[in-house]
Amino acid sequence: MKQLSDVKFSTLDLVPVRENGSPAQSLRNSLDLAQHVEKFGYTRFWVAEHHNMDGIASSATSVLLGYLAGGTSTIRVGSGGVMLPNHAPLVIAEQFGTLESLYPGRIDLGLGRAPGSDQMTARALRRERSGSADDFPEDVAELARFLGPRTPDQRVIAMPGTGTNVPIWLLGSSLFSAQLAGERGLPYAFASHFAPRFMHEAIRVYRNHFKPSAVLDKPYVMLGVPLVAADTDEQADYLATSVYQRILALMRGQSLVQRPPVKTMDGLWLPHEREAVGDFLGLAMVGSPQKIRAKLEVLIEQTQADELIFTCDLYEHADRLHSYELLAQVMKG
């Protein structure tokens, strides 16, 4: 049985934009966070791809990864993930081949099947209105070919890209990617940081369908976990109200800019909204290091996950840094 000490800890940054803040400051904060978690001992630092969201500045994922990798030295950096329906596989192979050539052995390519946007935004990204997600298995295979060794009959190559073998991960919040990752023998990351409902079933499907590959000889599961760590449980509960407001705004279709914490959420949400936010954040680790350690031990006992990737969207950058520092204490025992 796997123990908490056997599990790797990583970071997922949505590059949040705060109220009265700017994308430029958010991007600088992202690098500062990457530098800190590198020192804290985290395994990897991933950024997501989101479009047309005023509170998230990680839309140009590949460009941002170059900035992050250039400002760090040992931590792995990667996409969590590139939404493949938005892109031609060749372009992604060239972008990540370039990153791997510049920062060898430090680049991860996490792939998602959803567009990460609405239909209007998807059209603005120059893709078909519908159906592109159905091409995901073929697109993943094509991308893997571009990153693998060149074959004698291969007419189109990614340069850089060919032969770099950038590690591919499949990401998802449903059972589709879980089964595909298992069948392809790829590592699998489940988006339990916002969709924990099918977590246990997705892990089971992935492991049941797993076939050893040149990449993995046994399944490898990563789980997304929302994080709000503070010195006391009371302080963590207070800081978490910024997260609650953000999720509530997402559900209402409102602005996603980060708002400062409040003393109480009473009057800000309706009972059914409070329940919905609670479901969204069902796996959230909110509290002191002692409380979080106990909850993580239960999570690992139940899932036997190999790695946890934590996302922490607090209003003050200093509170985010401190949250990951406290979690590092849990990680190191």
Residue ranges and their predicted role:
Residues 1-72:
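N-terminal beta1-alpha1-beta2 module of alpha/beta enzyme domains
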Residues 2-5, 38, 65-74, 100-107, ...:
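Acidic (Asp/Glu)-rich catalytic clusters
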Residues 5-23, 85-148, 188:
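Flexible, glycine-rich active-site loops centered on histidine and acidic residues
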Residues 9-13, 45-47, 77-79, 107-111, ...:
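Hydrophobic faces of well-ordered beta-strands that scaffold small-molecule active sites
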Residues 13-28, 82-89, 162-172, 280-289:
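Active-site mouth loops of central-metabolism enzymes
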Residues 178-197, 202-203:
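A conserved active-site cap/scaffold subdomain adjacent to cofactor or substrate pockets
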